[in-house]
A protein has these predicted regions:
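Phosphate-moiety recognition in structured ligand-binding domains
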Residues: 1-222
Length: 222
């Protein structure tokens, strides 16, 4: 156990572990500063944004299945969203892990609903379940998702955003073709494309209504 006495010691610990990571990576023959698979997502995201600039809107994706609460994207089928997840998890094998990519509005309710889904999946399939909010996970575990041995089963959770803010085209300008919600959607799509390109198994569940209610329905169905 490391005892932290003040804010400065916290900074010292961060530096120590950054150095430890670099030293360990050196002896493992790994470049700790290389992130080729993070760049793969950025490349796809830039292409999505460029297409948005040209079209004036994000290109539509056709869902595989449409339910009252959610739309499902991916090569999958099922009678309910919970059934979709069960069918998706039939691919699971020893040594795999599940990853929830959460592109939802963070809140205490959302955290609890996502955590309930994580616990149910971990118990039912006896596999580790990673969970991260997008887009912030992209620069950390996002590298692992596309650069590992391909053991992940990815469930991406998205929603529409009622409140939005424009992103100015350049500093000091009011003109904007991009909003923060569109940027977030582009990042989710870009990572999904990068994962698919890398041969990873992924489905997307897009909540048309309250995602917390949708997650609770899935958990109850599982």
């Amino acid at each position: 156990t490391v005892k932290i006495n003040d804010d400065y010691e916290l900074g010292q610990q961060m530096y120590i572990w950054e150095m430890a990571t670099a030293v360990a990576a050196h002896f493992m023959g790994v470049n700790p500063f290389d992130q080729p698979d993070v760049e793969a997502t950025k490349k796809h995201t830039r292409a999505v944004i460029a297409d948005l600039d040209k079209r004036g809107e994000l290109a539509d994706e056709k869902p595989a299945i449409t339910f009252e609460q959610a739309e499902i994207f991916g090569n999958i089928n099922g009678a309910t969203p919970a059934d979709v997840i069960r069918n998706f998890m039939k691919q699971a094998k020893a040594g795999d892990y599940i990853c929830l990519q959460v592109f939802l509005i963070p809140s205490q309710e959302t955290n609890e609903a996502v955590n309930s889904l994580r616990k149910v999946l971990a118990c039912q399939y006896t596999l580790p379940v990673a969970c991260g909010y997008g887009p912030r996970y992209l620069h950390s575990t996002g590298q692992l998702h596309k650069g590992d041995a391909g053991n992940g089963l990815f469930i991406q959770l998205t929603q529409d955003f009622s409140l939005d803010v424009d992103v100015p085209d350049s500093i000091g300008e009011e003109k904007s073709f991009l909003t923060f919600s569109a940027l977030k959607a582009a990042q989710a799509k870009g990572d999904r494309q990068a994962l698919t390109e890398a041969g990873r198994r992924i489905i997307r569940i897009h909540f048309k209504k309250n995602p917390v209610d949708g997650l609770k329905t899935i958990v109850n169905g599982l």
